[in-house]
């Protein structure tokens, strides 16, 4: 990918929620590669809810793993939708089977991406969420 930066990405405030440290580091690296500079990381869904409830800022995007212990990505999505109805939410999953897709759509996930993913795939999903032309 020649120019992997998303125009205006440096202004986006992103909350990344991932319980697997290796997947978390990969996602952080990929987000930085596409130009996300303002990144807050939560180690799981419960941590994310705490960050959201305490935060003085509003995030522009939440990127969350689906399968996490205690507070799942679905539980986090439901919490977010109760308070921030229109906040863009990108779900990460290792298994996008039919049940996942139906449940995600029913709960108004904005987009999802299957792990492992490339910088180009993440760039495309985020660009589409914000209607940003990258070519």
For the regions a language model picked out, list residue spans one by one.
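Non-catalytic signal-transmission and effector/linker regions of two-component phosphorelay proteins
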Residues: 1-15, 120-135
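Conserved acidic carboxylate
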Residues: 18
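Two-component/phosphorelay signaling modules centered on CheY-like receiver
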Residues: 21-41
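Alpha4 helix (beta4-alpha4-beta5 surface) of REC/receiver domains from two-component response regulators
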Residues: 28, 75, 96-111
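Short hydrophobic/Thr-rich beta-strand motif most characteristic of the beta2 strand and flanking loop
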Residues: 36-43, 51, 113
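Acidic catalytic/metal-coordinating carboxylates
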Residues: 44-47, 72-75
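Active-site residues of response regulator receiver
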Residues: 65, 93
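Receiver (REC) domain active-site loop signature in two-component systems and cognate sites
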Residues: 68
């Amino acid at each position: 990918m020649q120019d992997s930066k998303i125009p205006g990405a440096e202004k986006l405030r992103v909350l990344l929620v991932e319980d697997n440290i290796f997947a978390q580091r990969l996602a952080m690296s990929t987000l930085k590669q596409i130009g996300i500079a303002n990144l807050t990381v939560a180690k799981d869904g419960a941590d994310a809810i705490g960050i959201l409830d305490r935060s003085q800022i509003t995030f522009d995007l939440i990127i969350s793993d689906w399968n996490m212990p205690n507070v799942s990505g679905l539980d986090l999505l439901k919490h977010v939708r109760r308070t921030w109805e229109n906040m863009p939410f990108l779900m990460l999953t290792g298994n996008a089977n039919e049940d996942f897709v139906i449940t995600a759509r029913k709960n108004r996930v904005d987009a999802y991406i299957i792990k492992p993913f490339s910088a180009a795939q993440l760039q495309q999903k985020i660009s589409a969420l914000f209607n940003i032309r990258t070519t």
